[in-house]
Protein backbone atom coordinates (compact mmCIF):
# COMPACT_ATOMS: atom_id res chain seq x y z
CA UNK A 1 0.00 0.00 0.00
CA UNK A 2 1.72 3.17 -1.19
CA UNK A 3 1.29 6.71 0.06
CA UNK A 4 1.83 5.92 3.74
CA UNK A 5 3.51 8.84 5.52
CA UNK A 6 6.30 8.63 8.09
CA UNK A 7 3.88 8.41 11.00
CA UNK A 8 1.98 5.57 9.40
CA UNK A 9 5.12 3.78 8.24
CA UNK A 10 6.06 3.20 11.86
CA UNK A 11 2.89 1.21 12.41
CA UNK A 12 3.27 -0.72 9.16
CA UNK A 13 6.83 -1.67 10.10
CA UNK A 14 5.64 -2.77 13.54
CA UNK A 15 2.92 -4.89 11.92
CA UNK A 16 5.44 -6.55 9.61
CA UNK A 17 7.70 -7.38 12.55
CA UNK A 18 4.88 -8.75 14.69
CA UNK A 19 3.54 -10.75 11.75
CA UNK A 20 6.94 -12.36 11.19
CA UNK A 21 8.01 -12.88 14.80
CA UNK A 22 4.69 -13.77 16.44
CA UNK A 23 1.77 -14.36 14.07
CA UNK A 24 3.64 -16.60 11.63
CA UNK A 25 5.18 -18.60 14.47
CA UNK A 26 1.77 -19.61 15.85
CA UNK A 27 -0.28 -19.65 12.63
CA UNK A 28 0.04 -23.36 11.89
CA UNK A 29 -0.99 -24.37 15.41
CA UNK A 30 -3.86 -21.87 15.44
CA UNK A 31 -5.10 -23.36 12.19
CA UNK A 32 -4.61 -26.99 13.20
CA UNK A 33 -6.32 -26.69 16.58
CA UNK A 34 -8.81 -23.94 15.74
CA UNK A 35 -7.78 -22.01 18.84
CA UNK A 36 -7.91 -18.26 19.37
CA UNK A 37 -4.49 -16.66 18.61
CA UNK A 38 -4.07 -15.07 22.03
CA UNK A 39 -0.31 -14.60 21.67
CA UNK A 40 -0.82 -12.72 18.41
CA UNK A 41 -3.66 -10.51 19.66
CA UNK A 42 -1.63 -9.67 22.77
CA UNK A 43 1.36 -8.76 20.58
CA UNK A 44 -0.79 -6.36 18.56
CA UNK A 45 -1.82 -4.64 21.78
CA UNK A 46 1.76 -4.44 23.09
CA UNK A 47 2.93 -2.83 19.88
CA UNK A 48 0.27 -0.12 19.78
CA UNK A 49 -1.65 -1.65 16.88
CA UNK A 50 -4.92 -2.31 18.73
CA UNK A 51 -5.51 1.43 18.96
CA UNK A 52 -4.19 2.20 15.47
CA UNK A 53 -7.23 4.19 14.37
CA UNK A 54 -8.51 5.37 17.76
CA UNK A 55 -8.49 9.17 18.16
CA UNK A 56 -5.11 10.62 19.04
CA UNK A 57 -6.56 12.79 21.81
CA UNK A 58 -7.67 9.60 23.57
CA UNK A 59 -4.29 7.92 23.26
CA UNK A 60 -4.80 6.19 19.93
CA UNK A 61 -2.75 6.30 16.76
CA UNK A 62 -5.25 8.47 14.90
CA UNK A 63 -4.50 6.68 11.64
CA UNK A 64 -6.89 6.37 8.71
CA UNK A 65 -7.88 3.83 6.10
CA UNK A 66 -4.59 3.79 4.19
CA UNK A 67 -2.44 2.81 7.16
CA UNK A 68 -5.14 0.42 8.38
CA UNK A 69 -5.10 -1.39 5.03
CA UNK A 70 -1.31 -1.55 4.98
CA UNK A 71 -1.22 -2.96 8.51
CA UNK A 72 -3.89 -5.61 7.81
CA UNK A 73 -2.05 -6.66 4.66
CA UNK A 74 1.09 -7.33 6.71
CA UNK A 75 -0.81 -9.19 9.43
CA UNK A 76 -2.56 -11.44 6.91
CA UNK A 77 0.80 -12.57 5.59
CA UNK A 78 1.57 -13.98 9.04
CA UNK A 79 -1.85 -15.26 10.14
CA UNK A 80 -5.12 -14.56 8.35
CA UNK A 81 -7.18 -15.53 11.40
CA UNK A 82 -5.47 -12.80 13.43
CA UNK A 83 -5.95 -10.33 10.58
CA UNK A 84 -9.68 -11.13 10.58
CA UNK A 85 -9.96 -10.59 14.33
CA UNK A 86 -8.09 -7.31 13.94
CA UNK A 87 -10.27 -6.13 11.06
CA UNK A 88 -13.43 -6.73 13.08
CA UNK A 89 -11.90 -4.99 16.10
CA UNK A 90 -10.92 -1.87 14.16
CA UNK A 91 -14.23 -1.76 12.27
CA UNK A 92 -16.22 -1.99 15.50
CA UNK A 93 -14.03 0.54 17.31
CA UNK A 94 -14.57 3.00 14.45
CA UNK A 95 -18.31 2.74 15.03
CA UNK A 96 -17.68 3.63 18.66
CA UNK A 97 -15.49 6.54 17.57
CA UNK A 98 -18.18 7.82 15.19
CA UNK A 99 -20.91 7.67 17.85
CA UNK A 100 -22.36 10.84 19.34
CA UNK A 101 -24.77 8.98 21.62
CA UNK A 102 -22.73 6.30 23.42
CA UNK A 103 -22.17 7.36 27.01
CA UNK A 104 -19.00 5.29 27.46
CA UNK A 105 -17.46 6.27 24.10
CA UNK A 106 -14.32 7.98 25.40
CA UNK A 107 -13.56 5.46 28.13
CA UNK A 108 -13.88 2.55 25.71
CA UNK A 109 -11.67 4.25 23.13
CA UNK A 110 -9.03 4.96 25.79
CA UNK A 111 -9.02 1.26 26.64
CA UNK A 112 -8.87 0.36 22.94
CA UNK A 113 -5.90 2.69 22.52
CA UNK A 114 -4.18 1.09 25.50
CA UNK A 115 -4.75 -2.41 24.14
CA UNK A 116 -7.10 -3.27 27.00
CA UNK A 117 -10.37 -3.61 25.09
CA UNK A 118 -11.12 -5.97 22.19
CA UNK A 119 -14.33 -5.32 20.31
CA UNK A 120 -16.09 -6.87 17.33
CA UNK A 121 -19.20 -6.75 15.14
CA UNK A 122 -22.37 -8.77 15.82
CA UNK A 123 -24.72 -8.23 12.88
CA UNK A 124 -25.78 -11.40 11.04
CA UNK A 125 -28.73 -13.24 12.59
CA UNK A 126 -30.06 -16.73 12.09
CA UNK A 127 -33.36 -15.58 10.58
CA UNK A 128 -31.83 -13.32 7.92
CA UNK A 129 -28.53 -15.22 7.60
CA UNK A 130 -25.89 -13.35 5.58
CA UNK A 131 -28.26 -10.46 4.83
CA UNK A 132 -26.76 -8.53 7.74
CA UNK A 133 -28.64 -5.34 6.83
CA UNK A 134 -31.93 -6.99 7.88
CA UNK A 135 -31.82 -7.74 11.62
CA UNK A 136 -34.61 -9.92 12.98
CA UNK A 137 -34.19 -8.74 16.57
CA UNK A 138 -35.99 -5.64 17.83
CA UNK A 139 -35.53 -3.41 20.84
CA UNK A 140 -38.58 -3.41 23.07
CA UNK A 141 -39.35 -0.77 25.73
CA UNK A 142 -38.97 -2.16 29.24
CA UNK A 143 -42.34 -2.40 30.94
CA UNK A 144 -42.68 0.29 33.59
CA UNK A 145 -38.98 1.17 33.39
CA UNK A 146 -36.64 3.34 31.38
CA UNK A 147 -34.66 1.63 28.64
CA UNK A 148 -35.04 -1.39 26.40
CA UNK A 149 -34.72 -5.14 26.29
CA UNK A 150 -33.58 -7.18 23.29
CA UNK A 151 -33.36 -10.85 22.41
CA UNK A 152 -31.44 -12.05 19.36
CA UNK A 153 -29.81 -15.06 17.79
CA UNK A 154 -26.62 -13.82 16.17
CA UNK A 155 -25.42 -16.44 13.71
CA UNK A 156 -21.66 -15.79 13.73
CA UNK A 157 -19.65 -13.40 15.88
CA UNK A 158 -15.87 -13.19 15.46
CA UNK A 159 -13.94 -13.27 18.77
CA UNK A 160 -17.23 -14.30 20.39
CA UNK A 161 -15.68 -15.57 23.63
CA UNK A 162 -12.79 -13.11 23.77
CA UNK A 163 -14.27 -9.71 22.90
CA UNK A 164 -14.98 -7.19 25.64
CA UNK A 165 -17.86 -5.68 23.67
CA UNK A 166 -20.01 -6.28 20.60
CA UNK A 167 -21.23 -3.61 18.21
CA UNK A 168 -24.66 -5.08 17.47
CA UNK A 169 -27.66 -4.24 15.31
CA UNK A 170 -31.40 -4.52 15.89
CA UNK A 171 -34.64 -2.99 14.68
CA UNK A 172 -35.81 0.05 16.57
CA UNK A 173 -38.96 -0.31 18.74
CA UNK A 174 -42.01 -0.60 16.50
CA UNK A 175 -39.92 -0.69 13.33
CA UNK A 176 -41.85 -0.73 10.08
CA UNK A 177 -39.08 -2.63 8.28
CA UNK A 178 -35.70 -4.27 9.01
CA UNK A 179 -33.90 -1.18 7.71
CA UNK A 180 -35.52 0.89 10.46
CA UNK A 181 -32.70 -0.09 12.77
CA UNK A 182 -30.31 1.02 15.48
CA UNK A 183 -26.79 0.00 16.53
CA UNK A 184 -25.94 -0.55 20.18
CA UNK A 185 -23.02 -1.65 22.33
CA UNK A 186 -23.36 -4.96 24.13
CA UNK A 187 -21.27 -6.42 26.93
CA UNK A 188 -20.93 -10.13 26.04
CA UNK A 189 -20.00 -11.19 29.56
CA UNK A 190 -23.49 -10.35 30.79
CA UNK A 191 -25.51 -13.34 31.96
CA UNK A 192 -28.07 -12.73 29.20
CA UNK A 193 -25.44 -13.40 26.50
CA UNK A 194 -24.41 -16.96 25.70
CA UNK A 195 -22.08 -18.30 23.01
CA UNK A 196 -22.92 -21.65 21.44
CA UNK A 197 -20.56 -24.28 20.11
CA UNK A 198 -17.09 -23.91 18.65
CA UNK A 199 -15.91 -22.95 15.19
CA UNK A 200 -14.61 -25.81 13.05
CA UNK A 201 -14.52 -24.13 9.68
CA UNK A 202 -12.58 -24.69 6.49
CA UNK A 203 -10.52 -21.52 6.80
CA UNK A 204 -9.83 -18.66 9.22
CA UNK A 205 -10.09 -21.36 11.85
CA UNK A 206 -8.69 -19.33 14.73
CA UNK A 207 -11.07 -16.39 14.78
CA UNK A 208 -13.35 -17.78 17.53
CA UNK A 209 -16.44 -17.32 15.40
CA UNK A 210 -19.54 -18.67 17.13
CA UNK A 211 -23.31 -18.25 17.27
CA UNK A 212 -24.45 -16.04 20.15
CA UNK A 213 -27.84 -16.18 21.85
CA UNK A 214 -29.05 -13.02 23.57
CA UNK A 215 -32.02 -13.38 25.91
CA UNK A 216 -33.71 -10.29 27.37
CA UNK A 217 -30.56 -8.18 27.41
CA UNK A 218 -31.17 -4.81 29.06
CA UNK A 219 -29.80 -1.56 27.69
CA UNK A 220 -30.52 2.14 27.82
CA UNK A 221 -30.23 5.16 25.56
CA UNK A 222 -26.66 5.61 26.75
CA UNK A 223 -25.76 2.25 25.14
CA UNK A 224 -27.00 3.28 21.69
CA UNK A 225 -24.36 4.00 19.06
CA UNK A 226 -26.67 6.11 16.91
CA UNK A 227 -30.11 7.68 16.93
CA UNK A 228 -33.13 5.43 16.55
CA UNK A 229 -33.66 4.58 12.89
CA UNK A 230 -30.12 5.54 11.88
CA UNK A 231 -28.63 2.05 12.09
CA UNK A 232 -28.71 1.40 8.35
CA UNK A 233 -27.04 4.72 7.61
CA UNK A 234 -24.29 4.09 10.16
CA UNK A 235 -23.78 0.61 8.76
CA UNK A 236 -23.45 1.99 5.24
CA UNK A 237 -21.29 4.99 6.13
CA UNK A 238 -19.02 3.54 8.84
CA UNK A 239 -19.20 -0.22 9.21
CA UNK A 240 -19.17 -1.19 5.54
CA UNK A 241 -16.22 0.97 4.40
CA UNK A 242 -13.94 -0.10 7.26
CA UNK A 243 -14.95 -3.74 7.00
CA UNK A 244 -14.63 -3.86 3.21
CA UNK A 245 -11.23 -2.16 3.19
CA UNK A 246 -9.98 -4.40 6.00
CA UNK A 247 -11.13 -7.66 4.44
CA UNK A 248 -9.83 -6.60 1.02
CA UNK A 249 -6.44 -5.89 2.58
CA UNK A 250 -6.56 -9.25 4.35
CA UNK A 251 -7.21 -11.02 1.04
CA UNK A 252 -4.39 -9.06 -0.59
CA UNK A 253 -2.03 -10.10 2.20
CA UNK A 254 -2.94 -13.73 1.59
CA UNK A 255 -2.13 -13.19 -2.09
CA UNK A 256 1.24 -11.60 -1.34
CA UNK A 257 2.25 -14.45 0.93
CA UNK A 258 1.14 -17.04 -1.63
CA UNK A 259 3.26 -15.32 -4.29
CA UNK A 260 6.33 -15.25 -2.04
CA UNK A 261 5.96 -18.88 -0.96
CA UNK A 262 5.50 -20.01 -4.55
CA UNK A 263 8.47 -17.98 -5.74
CA UNK A 264 10.68 -19.47 -3.03
CA UNK A 265 9.48 -22.96 -3.94
CA UNK A 266 10.24 -22.53 -7.64
CA UNK A 267 13.68 -21.09 -6.94
CA UNK A 268 14.66 -23.51 -4.19
CA UNK A 269 13.37 -26.84 -5.52
CA UNK A 270 15.35 -28.85 -8.05
CA UNK A 271 15.15 -31.72 -10.50
CA UNK A 272 18.32 -33.39 -9.32
CA UNK A 273 18.40 -35.84 -12.22
CA UNK A 274 18.50 -32.97 -14.71
CA UNK A 275 20.38 -30.40 -12.66
CA UNK A 276 17.57 -27.86 -13.16
CA UNK A 277 15.18 -25.88 -10.96
CA UNK A 278 11.39 -25.80 -10.94
CA UNK A 279 11.69 -22.22 -12.19
CA UNK A 280 13.09 -23.59 -15.45
CA UNK A 281 9.63 -24.89 -16.36
CA UNK A 282 7.71 -22.26 -18.40
CA UNK A 283 4.29 -23.39 -17.13
CA UNK A 284 5.30 -22.83 -13.50
CA UNK A 285 6.76 -19.42 -14.29
CA UNK A 286 3.53 -18.54 -16.08
CA UNK A 287 1.47 -19.50 -13.05
CA UNK A 288 3.64 -17.35 -10.81
CA UNK A 289 3.29 -14.45 -13.25
CA UNK A 290 -0.50 -14.79 -13.24
CA UNK A 291 -0.49 -14.85 -9.45
CA UNK A 292 1.58 -11.68 -9.27
CA UNK A 293 -0.56 -9.81 -11.80
CA UNK A 294 -3.84 -10.72 -10.07
CA UNK A 295 -2.39 -9.69 -6.73
CA UNK A 296 -1.19 -6.30 -7.92
CA UNK A 297 -4.46 -5.60 -9.75
CA UNK A 298 -6.39 -6.11 -6.52
CA UNK A 299 -3.91 -4.05 -4.52
CA UNK A 300 -4.07 -1.21 -7.04
CA UNK A 301 -7.87 -1.07 -6.88
CA UNK A 302 -7.77 -1.00 -3.09
CA UNK A 303 -5.19 1.80 -3.13
CA UNK A 304 -7.44 3.78 -5.47
CA UNK A 305 -10.42 3.11 -3.22
CA UNK A 306 -8.56 4.37 -0.16
CA UNK A 307 -7.70 7.55 -2.07
CA UNK A 308 -11.39 7.91 -2.94
CA UNK A 309 -12.29 7.57 0.74
CA UNK A 310 -9.89 10.40 1.55
CA UNK A 311 -11.91 12.64 -0.81
CA UNK A 312 -15.32 10.98 -1.17
CA UNK A 313 -17.58 11.43 -4.16
CA UNK A 314 -20.85 9.82 -5.21
CA UNK A 315 -18.93 6.94 -6.80
CA UNK A 316 -16.84 6.14 -3.72
CA UNK A 317 -19.26 3.52 -2.28
CA UNK A 318 -19.04 1.55 -5.53
CA UNK A 319 -15.24 1.45 -5.33
CA UNK A 320 -15.48 0.22 -1.74
CA UNK A 321 -17.60 -2.72 -2.86
CA UNK A 322 -15.50 -3.36 -5.97
CA UNK A 323 -12.26 -3.45 -4.00
CA UNK A 324 -13.57 -6.10 -1.61
CA UNK A 325 -14.96 -8.16 -4.49
CA UNK A 326 -11.76 -7.92 -6.54
CA UNK A 327 -9.55 -8.85 -3.61
CA UNK A 328 -11.69 -11.81 -2.54
CA UNK A 329 -11.73 -13.16 -6.08
CA UNK A 330 -7.99 -12.58 -6.45
CA UNK A 331 -7.26 -14.48 -3.24
CA UNK A 332 -9.20 -17.52 -4.45
CA UNK A 333 -7.55 -17.43 -7.89
CA UNK A 334 -4.04 -16.77 -6.59
CA UNK A 335 -4.09 -19.49 -3.95
CA UNK A 336 -5.55 -21.94 -6.46
CA UNK A 337 -2.60 -21.24 -8.76
CA UNK A 338 -0.24 -21.53 -5.80
CA UNK A 339 -1.53 -25.00 -5.02
CA UNK A 340 -1.01 -26.05 -8.64
CA UNK A 341 2.46 -24.53 -8.81
CA UNK A 342 3.39 -26.11 -5.48
CA UNK A 343 2.27 -29.55 -6.58
CA UNK A 344 2.82 -32.33 -4.08
CA UNK A 345 4.68 -30.04 -1.70
CA UNK A 346 1.59 -27.84 -1.42
CA UNK A 347 -0.99 -30.62 -1.23
CA UNK A 348 0.99 -32.51 1.41
CA UNK A 349 1.30 -29.35 3.53
CA UNK A 350 5.09 -29.22 3.24
CA UNK A 351 4.55 -25.54 2.48
CA UNK A 352 1.79 -23.45 4.12
CA UNK A 353 0.07 -22.60 0.83
CA UNK A 354 -2.70 -25.06 1.68
CA UNK A 355 -3.67 -22.99 4.73
CA UNK A 356 -3.78 -19.84 2.61
CA UNK A 357 -5.91 -21.71 0.06
CA UNK A 358 -8.51 -22.44 2.74
CA UNK A 359 -8.33 -19.03 4.39
CA UNK A 360 -8.91 -17.33 1.03
CA UNK A 361 -12.23 -19.11 0.61
CA UNK A 362 -13.70 -17.90 3.89
CA UNK A 363 -14.22 -14.43 2.46
CA UNK A 364 -16.64 -15.70 -0.15
CA UNK A 365 -19.25 -16.66 2.44
CA UNK A 366 -18.65 -13.78 4.83
CA UNK A 367 -21.31 -11.09 4.53
CA UNK A 368 -21.45 -9.23 2.31
CA UNK A 369 -20.77 -12.38 0.29
CA UNK A 370 -19.40 -12.37 -3.23
CA UNK A 371 -22.94 -12.81 -4.55
CA UNK A 372 -24.13 -9.85 -2.48
CA UNK A 373 -21.23 -7.71 -3.68
CA UNK A 374 -21.99 -8.43 -7.32
CA UNK A 375 -25.62 -7.50 -6.74
CA UNK A 376 -24.79 -4.36 -4.73
CA UNK A 377 -22.42 -3.14 -7.43
CA UNK A 378 -24.95 -3.88 -10.16
CA UNK A 379 -27.66 -2.04 -8.23
CA UNK A 380 -25.42 0.97 -7.74
CA UNK A 381 -24.46 1.08 -11.42
CA UNK A 382 -28.11 0.96 -12.47
CA UNK A 383 -29.35 3.55 -9.99
CA UNK A 384 -31.07 1.23 -7.52
CA UNK A 385 -30.74 1.56 -3.71
CA UNK A 386 -28.11 -0.67 -2.13
CA UNK A 387 -30.38 -2.28 0.46
Regions found by a protein language model. Give the residues of each.
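Residue-level recognition of alpha-helical structural elements
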Residues: 4, 8, 33, 37, ...
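Glycine-rich phosphate/pyrophosphate-binding beta-alpha loops
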Residues: 155-160, 240-246, 363-366
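Alpha-helical transition-metal enzyme core signature, strongest for iron centers
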Residues: 252-255, 259, 291-298, 302, ...
Amino acid sequence: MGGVDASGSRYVAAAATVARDVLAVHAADVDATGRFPSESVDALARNGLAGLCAPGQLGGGGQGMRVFAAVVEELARGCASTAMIYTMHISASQVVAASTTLDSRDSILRDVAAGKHLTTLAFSEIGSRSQFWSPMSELEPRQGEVGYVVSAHKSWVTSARHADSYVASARRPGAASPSDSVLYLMRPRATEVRTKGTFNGLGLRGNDSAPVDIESYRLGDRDLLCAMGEGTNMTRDVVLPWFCVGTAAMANGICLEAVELTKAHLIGSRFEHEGSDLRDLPILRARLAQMSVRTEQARALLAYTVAELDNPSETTPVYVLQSRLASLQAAVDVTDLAMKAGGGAAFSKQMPVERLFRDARAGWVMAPTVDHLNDFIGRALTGLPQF
